[in-house]
Amino acid sequence: MERPQKMPKVAKVKNKAPAEVQITAEQLLREAKERDLEILPPPPKQKISDPAELADYQQRKRKTFEDNLRKNRMVVSHWIKYAQWEEQQQEIQRARSIWERALDNEHRNVTLWLKYAEMEMKNKQVNHARNLWDRAVTIMPRVNQFWYKYTYMEEMLENVAGARQVFERWMEWQPEEQAWQTYVNFELRYKEIDRAREIYERFVYVHPDVKNWIKFARFEESHGFIHGSRRVFERAVEFFGDDYIEERLFIAFARFEEGQKEHDRARIIYKYALDHLPKDRTQELFKAYTKHEKKYGDRAGIEDVIVSKRKYQYEQEVAANPTNYDAWFDYLRLIEAEGDRDQIRETYERAISNVPPANEKNFWRRYIYLWINYALYEELEAEDAERTRQIYKTCLELIPHKQFTFSKLWLLYAQFEIRCKELQRARKALGLAIGMCPRDKLFRGYIDLEIQLREFERCRMLYEKFLEFGPENCVTWMKFAELENLLGDTDRARAIFELAVQQPRLDMPELLWKAYIDFEVALGETELARQLYERLLERTQHVKVWMSFAKFEMGLSHGDSGPDAELNVQLARRIYERANEMLRQLGDKESRVLLLEAWRDFERDASDSQEMQKVMDKMPRRIKKRQKIVSDNGVEEGWEEVFDYIFPEDEMARPNLKLLAAAKMWKTQKDNTVDDPPATAIASEPEPAADAAPADTTDSGD
């Protein structure tokens, strides 16, 4: 077995106190700097004094270079240093040989070709340099630096034809845009405008970019060829078509025309661009168009620009949120103002295609008005009745009538058919609407239509159908009775009112009873009206009913000699007395106060001071008292101050309570013995008052 290897023990530090002298980082750096080795002196310069020493020196250097190349032939810097050293020694042939060996070793190294050609040009070896550039561009035609150097050399040698020939060879490879621009600039330096134009003709098809077409057009303009520049812009618009065109081209085209004072042409270009470009790519175009119109346009032109800009904004809004119906309404109003029928219809079709995402009426309210406006436009502006009818039918088929409907739409459709003299279609549509979704508005609209047509039998049938669906609707009963009254059939109207008031459930019974009473009063049936008031009071004791009853009695006429004021006052006063007594029994203090105030005003108008004083004696006084606040859970939450009314009649009706309090006090005094001190009796005297106070408070709260 191998013995376990023993690890050296960690030396224990006996003294862990900090050293007295602390070493800083600055001190460490200073000591390291002081201990640096001294800089070696440069080697001595060697002076060569005769050809033998020179030959020996050259042999040693060449041997060093060759050794380096044998060690690593792939290091380009060794070749370059070797060739440049030979060039310094004026050994051009040797240097050329080294460059050739380097190219044989790595012929695709751009630096080698450039250095080699630079050496030939520096030593004025033009043919060698030309041959070298030919070889370079043949091997690597995509290296633009070779072509730039080659053409520059030929141009410096004033060999313009040779430089042009090199450019042509270069252009056959369809280089980048800068190369074409360099060729154009070369021709322009020698005033060869036609040649430059030919280069541009080829350039814009090799690199079909908008900016290159704009450069071509500006080239023509800068040399005075205005028609040529315009023709270039027109060709560019045709070349790109509607799919690939950009707003930059139209802006440049319009500014060109603006510079030539052709403002109408510029305006047409802007409008054409706005019509054919997608709306999300015309922001700068709008700005340029607006500036142009502000500088050169009239009021109509400026308004046209503003309208176009607003159309673009609305297009963005509806594209971002297709269910933004408010934006659709604004957009459609703008389109309708222009009057382009096809565009209006197309926009309406786009708008109505955005159906609300959920079958909830709140989402559909604004959407339905798109259909309504569409139908009204087709009827009133386009005057296309068949298309209008189809719009209404399509919309009605789209609405989920089992969940909700729109009565307004049914009625508009029926009214449209009436205007088209299609009465049967209108009735059929409304009948279908009532059968599918009986709504109050539908019934009333249908009834109003039949009343206008003087079809009263149909009105009766519709009212009967209406009341079958909603017998609790008081307005329907009132309208039905009003119709019969207008037709002179009072018995039928009275029977309708009787049926109405006998319904077990009504939404607004007070209006129905009032209408019934007004109906009888208008017929002069005073006794029947009084009976109706009595019947109504059997059902409710509301203070307003009593007040209305009193006013009714006050306004009656008795006999043929005119109104009997005294009799009316007595009848009305009797009603007030009955009402006061009834409300007192019910304990309705608030209503009782209202009644007494109305009674007081009545007596003031009657100018009867005696009766007026009686009423004033009945007026209550208002007091403030505290009562407990009890929550819905029955928990007491504190006290609050409330106002209450104390009526004199109620206080007079409390003798029994006062008698009970006095009897209790007498009993207390009797229970006290004769031996008790008087102070005890005196102390017990307030007890009945304390007992009576709660009784009074309780009574006042009843």
UniProtKB/Swiss-Prot annotation:
HAT repeat residues: 56-88, 90-122, 124-156, 158-189, 191-222, 224-259, 261-295, 305-337, 339-373, 383-419, 454-486, 488-522, 524-555
One MF annotation (Gene Ontology) recorded for this entry: RNA binding
Annotated spans, Disordered: 670-702
Keywords: Developmental protein, Differentiation, mRNA processing, mRNA splicing, Neurogenesis, Nucleus, Repeat
Residue numbers covered by motif Nuclear localization signal: 620-628
KO phenotype (gene knockout): Causes defects in the proliferation of brain neuroblasts and results in the absence of identified neuronal lineages in the central and peripheral nervous systems. During embryonic Malpighian morphogenesis, most of the cells of the Malpighian tubules fail to undergo rearrangement to form tubes with a two cell circumference. Only cells at the distal end of the tubule rearrange.
Gene Ontology cellular-component annotations: catalytic step 2 spliceosome; cytosol; nuclear speck; nucleus; post-mRNA release spliceosomal complex; precatalytic spliceosome; Prp19 complex; U2-type catalytic step 2 spliceosome
Tissue specificity statement from the Swiss-Prot or TrEMBL entry: Transcribed in all cells during embryonic development.
Composition bias, Low complexity: 683-702
One GO BP annotation of this record: Malpighian tubule morphogenesis
Major localization listed first in the record, in broad terms: nucleus
Function: May be involved in pre-mRNA splicing process. Involved in embryonic neurogenesis and cell rearrangement during Malpighian tubule morphogenesis.
Assembly information from the UniProt record: Colocalizes with a complex containing snRNP proteins.
The protein's name in its UniProt record: Protein crooked neck
Source organism: Drosophila melanogaster
